[in-house]
Amino acid sequence: MRLKRIAAMLTAAVMAVSLAACGGNTDTNTESSQNPQENAEAQAVHLNLAESWGFEYFYTIITPEVSSSSYDITYYLTSFYDTLFEYNSEGEVVGVLAEDWSMSEDGKTYTFQIKQGIKFSDGSDLTAEDVAKSILAVPVNLGQYNGSYGRLSTIIEDAVATDEYTVELHLTQPYYNTLRELCLANPFGIVSSEQFNEDLTAKQESFRSATYGTGPYMYAGDNDGQTWNFVRNPNYWGDAPEVDSFSIKYIPDNDAKILAMQNGEVDFLSGIKNVSAESYAQMEQTDGFGAQADEKSLQTYYVGYNLNSEIFGDQVVREAISSAIDKDA
């Protein structure tokens, strides 16, 4: 079973349920080596996945700063684009591209020291200028959707590269959630500054042919608009992922996805939008397939009240309902 390899590939896929076909989709060198370690290194691991997105929007959403399409696609973005920060397994914010950071006394200026020696997938060096432009480009490219991923993008006053590896982020007011929102690859994934026009709009034609990030994978083209292919980033600065490449097949119907998995066309499905509870229960009992439900998920759910309702317009009623909910259950 390749569940560990799958997990190593999709570092951003924090989804509720997943199904995986057991066995291998590996290409091996026809000349067998006497050394088992060399044989293992000769294997090329490829995964086939399936999603329901409207891929006519894919090339815009693959740009981190543009968010006018499916939220599901954002799960893949950290495979291509690193962020300044991320959450560790304990839910704490830790640096990724940011090596060190500080905040001014008034809480309106953050200073980030950027790690050195990191390259984009096109081989160019990551510098503070790339980080500053990526941040400034967020509200420009989000446009009418600015603020849809959090408040930070609405209070950016400026982002300045003060030297080759130092960035200052200036806000119009203090904001407690700044570092947490900088963990989001959409919209705060770091992109090569060469991929923005002078007005900071993204060069969409460039993103039709490549991804320009520092993440473990990069875009490798599509097959007639039905399958999108991704391979390892040869310039990746971190530990090389165990999966060499993966493809995302466009299969809009969930039953067709399950059939494709049974036929060996798809290796992995994840998320409740791709796998119904009934299909999950069925495949969990089927030989040759692995099933896993995440025990932890970094998501927020809320219940909103319709204040125009005669019942819920009464604050006492709302407080009574809120008090009756066991929040520790």
Predicted feature locations:
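Gly/Pro-rich hinge or "lid" segments in bacterial periplasmic/extracellular proteins
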Residues: Y71, N88, L184-P241, S245
